[in-house]
A protein has these predicted regions:
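Alpha/beta catalytic cores of nucleotide-metabolism and tRNA/nucleoside-modifying enzymes
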Residues: 1-4, 11, 15, 21, ...
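N-terminal small/glycine-rich loop or linker at the start of catalytic domains
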Residues: 4-16, 48-69, 103-111, 128-140, ...
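Glycine-rich, positively charged N-terminal anion/phosphate-binding segment
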Residues: 2-7, 20-95
Length: 338
């Protein structure tokens, strides 16, 4: 099996971790890399903020050695400013630069950035050209199927990006109009793969190893990008990698392993950001670890109340207690959190 490459960078695996605002900080990226993510990417950062030297924005670039290539994702709608942003961060430690052409958030598209760029493939190409000219790192692009049902432009945008120097394209198989509603169109990933010569990643609704194999089999894509499904379940990468590489499926982590991962992630968040900043962010992170547990909705409500690091121990104790009580009850009814 040919390895997946970003320019001169060879990835360890073909399943990679996609960027998500508010989630893919350094502790989260480290956890995913340890479980086999082929690369990780920062939260998206504003090109304008980078050019103006905003310290809060620059803090999002923080890199931690984690054994996998690390990319910085930037967003913006003005080619020249995107190029200036690429130049402004040359001094920082990262392996590749990713351009956001897929974010569907209203506050991003209202300014003309994110998936709004896909309405104009020429602008997409000019942005990539400016970034390539101003960085020494390989440049990748994350995009969607298109803007809406009347503007399916992924193929045109991908070709423009490739011509301008992008070395990889990741395609989320929904339009911006669809946001994250159920149902993806894998055929758009196949069409992009057939239209360009650079590696293509398929993205969207990859929750299991079989989902990943289906994406690769039906589209011919070179790898898969997993994002939301890996939150609270970093071991998903181990299962997907094993399936892609034809290896035996790894064992499912037990509850203790899951809670150990949760605690370590939150501890590192507090260590890096301080409790006041980290704990509100940890509420959303910890909710994902409740997936599949008995009484999960009650446990998620408790996650919303986390304020101090020691609250994590109380949460973990509650998780174990909830599962014991559910097992004793021997049914699937939710047991109210005390």
């Amino acid at each position: 099996m040919e390895p997946l490459k970003l320019g001169n960078i060879t990835l360890p695996h073909k399943a990679v971790f996609g960027p998500m605002a508010g989630f893919t900080d350094a502790p989260c990226r480290r956890l995913m890399a340890e479980h086999g993510a082929g690369f990780t990417v920062s939260e998206m950062v504003s090109s304008r903020a980078l050019v103006y030297g905003d310290h809060k924005t620059v803090s999002l670039l923080k890199a931690e050695p984690n054994g996998a290539p690390y990319g910085v994702q930037i967003f913006g709608e003005v080619p020249e400013i995107m190029g200036q942003a690429a130049a402004a961060i040359e001094q920082y430690r990262f392996d590749f630069l990713d351009i956001n052409m897929g974010c569907p958030a209203p506050k991003i598209v209202s300014g003309g950035a994110g998936s709004k760029l896909m309405l104009d493939p020429d602008v997409c190409g000019r942005i990539v050209e400016q970034v390539v000219q101003n960085t020494s790192r390989p440049v990748t692009v994350k995009m969607r199927k298109g803007w809406d049902a009347d503007h399916i432009t992924a193929v045109e945008c991908a070709k423009a990006c490739e011509q301008a120097g992008a070395v990889l394209v990741a395609v989320h198989a929904r339009t911006r109009e669809q946001m994250y509603t159920p149902g993806i169109d894998r055929s758009i990933v196949r069409k992009v793969k057939e239209a360009v010569h650079v590696p293509v990643l398929g993205n969207g609704d990859i929750h299991t190893a079989e989902d990943a194999l289906t994406m690769m089999r039906e589209t011919g894509c070179d790898g898969v990008m997993i994002a939301r499904a890996a939150l609270g379940a970093p071991w998903l990468f181990e299962r997907v990698n094993a399936a892609i590489e034809g290896l035996p499926a790894p064992k499912e982590p037990n509850l203790q392993a899951r809670m150990n991962a949760l605690r370590r992630q939150v501890e590192e968040m507090v260590e890096q950001k301080g409790e006041f900043v980290a704990m509100p962010q940890a509420r959303a992170q910890t909710m994902h670890y409740m997936k599949g547990l008995k009484g999960a909705s009650a446990l998620r409500r408790y996650c919303c109340e986390l304020s101090h690091l020691e609250d994590i121990d109380t949460l973990i104790e509650a998780v174990f207690d909830q599962q014991r009580r559910a097992a004793d009850a021997d049914d699937n009814r939710e047991i109210p959190f005390p």
